[in-house]
Amino acid sequence: MQTVIEDSVNDSILFSMWKIFLIINISNLFFYWFHRLLHVPFMFRYVHSKHHEFIEPIGVAALYAHPIEHFLANTFSFICPFLYIGCNYYIMLGLLFGGSIIPVFYHTKSFRFFNDHLVHHQLFKYNFGFGGYLDKIFGTYNGGLANSAKYNLA
Protein backbone atom coordinates (compact mmCIF):
# COMPACT_ATOMS: atom_id res chain seq x y z
CA MET A 1 0.00 0.00 0.00
CA GLN A 2 1.42 3.36 -1.01
CA THR A 3 1.32 6.40 1.22
CA VAL A 4 0.16 9.87 0.20
CA ILE A 5 3.82 10.91 0.16
CA GLU A 6 4.84 8.11 -2.22
CA ASP A 7 1.88 8.88 -4.48
CA SER A 8 3.07 12.49 -4.80
CA VAL A 9 6.72 11.90 -5.71
CA ASN A 10 6.18 12.49 -9.44
CA ASP A 11 3.85 15.50 -9.21
CA SER A 12 4.59 18.34 -11.63
CA ILE A 13 5.92 21.60 -10.22
CA LEU A 14 2.63 23.37 -10.99
CA PHE A 15 0.59 20.62 -9.29
CA SER A 16 2.96 20.67 -6.31
CA MET A 17 2.52 24.45 -6.02
CA TRP A 18 -1.26 23.97 -6.11
CA LYS A 19 -0.97 21.41 -3.30
CA ILE A 20 1.19 23.78 -1.24
CA PHE A 21 -1.43 26.51 -1.69
CA LEU A 22 -4.22 24.13 -0.66
CA ILE A 23 -2.36 22.71 2.34
CA ILE A 24 -1.47 26.16 3.69
CA ASN A 25 -4.97 27.55 3.24
CA ILE A 26 -6.83 24.50 4.55
CA SER A 27 -4.49 24.40 7.56
CA ASN A 28 -5.15 28.08 8.16
CA LEU A 29 -8.92 27.52 7.88
CA PHE A 30 -8.81 24.65 10.40
CA PHE A 31 -6.57 26.67 12.71
CA TYR A 32 -8.81 29.74 12.49
CA TRP A 33 -11.95 27.81 13.47
CA PHE A 34 -10.26 25.74 16.17
CA HIS A 35 -8.81 28.98 17.56
CA ARG A 36 -12.27 30.58 17.55
CA LEU A 37 -13.60 27.47 19.33
CA LEU A 38 -10.89 27.89 21.96
CA HIS A 39 -12.31 31.36 22.69
CA VAL A 40 -15.75 30.02 23.62
CA PRO A 41 -15.94 30.83 27.37
CA PHE A 42 -15.75 27.21 28.62
CA MET A 43 -12.85 26.31 26.32
CA PHE A 44 -11.06 29.58 27.03
CA ARG A 45 -11.32 29.15 30.79
CA TYR A 46 -10.15 25.54 30.94
CA VAL A 47 -7.92 25.22 27.89
CA HIS A 48 -6.83 28.35 26.00
CA SER A 49 -6.30 30.73 28.93
CA LYS A 50 -2.92 29.05 29.49
CA HIS A 51 -1.70 30.42 26.16
CA HIS A 52 -3.12 33.89 26.92
CA GLU A 53 -1.12 34.23 30.11
CA PHE A 54 1.24 36.10 27.78
CA ILE A 55 -0.43 39.49 27.23
CA GLU A 56 2.81 40.68 25.70
CA PRO A 57 3.67 37.54 23.77
CA ILE A 58 7.19 36.26 23.24
CA GLY A 59 8.32 33.49 20.90
CA VAL A 60 7.91 30.72 23.46
CA ALA A 61 4.21 31.68 23.84
CA ALA A 62 3.58 30.01 20.47
CA LEU A 63 4.10 26.63 22.14
CA TYR A 64 2.89 27.52 25.63
CA ALA A 65 -0.51 25.84 25.54
CA HIS A 66 -2.75 23.22 27.08
CA PRO A 67 -2.36 19.72 25.50
CA ILE A 68 -5.91 19.87 24.08
CA GLU A 69 -5.04 23.13 22.35
CA HIS A 70 -1.86 21.60 20.95
CA PHE A 71 -3.80 18.68 19.54
CA LEU A 72 -6.66 20.69 18.01
CA ALA A 73 -5.08 23.92 16.84
CA ASN A 74 -1.40 23.13 16.47
CA THR A 75 -1.35 19.50 15.36
CA PHE A 76 -4.68 18.35 13.94
CA SER A 77 -5.29 21.51 11.91
CA PHE A 78 -1.85 21.23 10.34
CA ILE A 79 -1.52 17.47 9.76
CA CYS A 80 -4.98 16.72 8.31
CA PRO A 81 -4.45 18.57 5.00
CA PHE A 82 -1.21 16.61 4.45
CA LEU A 83 -3.03 13.34 4.98
CA TYR A 84 -5.90 14.27 2.69
CA ILE A 85 -4.07 16.12 -0.10
CA GLY A 86 -0.62 14.56 0.08
CA CYS A 87 2.62 16.03 -1.17
CA ASN A 88 6.16 14.89 -1.67
CA TYR A 89 8.47 14.42 1.27
CA TYR A 90 10.57 17.57 0.72
CA ILE A 91 7.55 19.84 0.42
CA MET A 92 6.11 18.29 3.57
CA LEU A 93 9.36 18.94 5.47
CA GLY A 94 9.48 22.53 4.23
CA LEU A 95 5.87 23.19 5.23
CA LEU A 96 6.37 21.54 8.61
CA PHE A 97 9.43 23.72 9.20
CA GLY A 98 7.54 26.85 8.18
CA GLY A 99 4.54 25.81 10.26
CA SER A 100 6.83 25.44 13.26
CA ILE A 101 8.77 28.69 12.93
CA ILE A 102 6.10 31.15 11.75
CA PRO A 103 4.04 30.93 14.99
CA VAL A 104 7.16 31.94 16.91
CA PHE A 105 7.40 35.10 14.78
CA TYR A 106 3.67 35.71 15.31
CA HIS A 107 4.40 35.94 19.01
CA THR A 108 7.18 38.53 18.79
CA LYS A 109 7.11 42.26 18.15
CA SER A 110 10.22 42.11 15.97
CA PHE A 111 8.37 41.85 12.65
CA ARG A 112 5.70 44.41 11.76
CA PHE A 113 4.04 41.87 9.42
CA PHE A 114 2.99 39.84 12.46
CA ASN A 115 1.69 42.73 14.60
CA ASP A 116 -1.96 41.71 14.16
CA HIS A 117 -1.47 38.82 16.52
CA LEU A 118 -0.31 41.21 19.24
CA VAL A 119 -3.81 42.74 19.08
CA HIS A 120 -5.22 39.25 19.63
CA HIS A 121 -3.22 38.87 22.84
CA GLN A 122 -4.42 42.26 24.06
CA LEU A 123 -8.11 42.14 23.13
CA PHE A 124 -8.73 38.37 22.69
CA LYS A 125 -11.63 38.70 20.22
CA TYR A 126 -9.79 39.67 17.03
CA ASN A 127 -7.20 38.21 14.66
CA PHE A 128 -7.60 34.45 15.14
CA GLY A 129 -5.90 33.29 11.93
CA PHE A 130 -2.59 33.73 10.17
CA GLY A 131 -2.23 36.47 7.59
CA GLY A 132 -5.47 38.26 8.43
CA TYR A 133 -7.45 37.24 5.33
CA LEU A 134 -9.78 34.83 7.17
CA ASP A 135 -10.33 37.42 9.89
CA LYS A 136 -11.32 39.91 7.20
CA ILE A 137 -13.70 37.39 5.63
CA PHE A 138 -15.32 36.41 8.94
CA GLY A 139 -15.37 39.90 10.49
CA THR A 140 -12.79 39.36 13.24
CA TYR A 141 -9.98 41.51 11.86
CA ASN A 142 -8.54 44.43 13.83
CA GLY A 143 -5.53 46.05 12.19
CA GLY A 144 -4.75 48.57 14.93
CA LEU A 145 -2.70 47.95 18.02
CA ALA A 146 -4.61 48.29 21.26
CA ASN A 147 -1.54 49.60 23.04
CA SER A 148 1.05 50.36 20.36
CA ALA A 149 3.16 52.54 22.68
CA LYS A 150 3.68 49.57 25.01
CA TYR A 151 5.02 47.53 22.10
CA ASN A 152 7.08 50.41 20.70
CA LEU A 153 5.40 49.99 17.33
CA ALA A 154 3.59 53.30 16.78
What are these regions (language model features)?
Residues 8-9, 41-154:
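Cytosolic/stromal cytosol-facing helical appendages immediately following the last transmembrane segment
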Residues 24-45:
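Transmembrane alpha-helix/helix-exit interface in multi-pass inner-membrane proteins
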Residues 1-27:
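Juxtamembrane helix-loop-helix connectors linking adjacent transmembrane helices
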Residues 17, 21, 33-34, 64-65, ...:
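Hydrophobic alpha-helical transmembrane segments of multi-pass membrane proteins
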